[in-house]
Regions:
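Glycan-recognition and catalytic cores of secretory/periplasmic carbohydrate-active enzymes
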Residues: 1-150
């Protein structure tokens, strides 16, 4: 139980510090106090900037936030999940060809049109969304409510 409480607390604090209040989504890299001061040119070799939105981070955050909401019943966690899910659907998902873009600019526009590559395959996004759908199905089965939280 102690580890579970720590994990759920970490999810909440991490989301609160990394959520981009100006444009939405999760920022790629921040310092441990939630600022960008030390990461202006972070990971230049991989061509990722601190303020970009990376598919993997968003997908894992969706799973973590929904798991936290499910385990705690915390309405704030439900709202954080819903906010991030709707943002991802609007910005990452390509309605014409499916799948998510790999990297977005800070404002949510696609930085590149790629949807696959060395590190991004057609596994993580379906797995994350499937995991979320399982939690949501469980919630609906237990409560009969498909509108209140999500």
């Amino acid at each position: 139980p102690e580890y579970a409480e720590r994990a759920l607390h970490t999810i909440s604090v991490t989301y609160q510090r990394s959520h981009d209040e100006k444009f939405g989504g999760i920022l790629h890299m921040l310092s441990d106090n939630g600022t960008d001061e030390q990461y202006k040119d972070w990971n230049a070799a991989r061509h990722l900037k601190w303020d970009e939105k990376v598919w993997w981070t968003q997908a894992e955050a969706l799973c973590a936030l929904l798991t936290s909401a499910d385990r705690t019943g915390d309405s704030a966690a439900w709202e954080e999940f819903k906010t991030l899910f709707l943002w991802c659907r609007e910005h990452f998902f390509d309605p014409d060809y499916g799948e998510w873009y790999a990297v977005l600019n800070r404002d949510g526009s696609p930085r590149m049109k790629l949807k696959g590559g060395i590190q991004k395959a057609a596994f993580h996004i379906p797995r994350a969304l499937y995991q979320c759908s399982c939690i949501l199905k469980k919630y609906v089965a237990e409560t009969g409510d498909c509108d209140a939280q999500t």
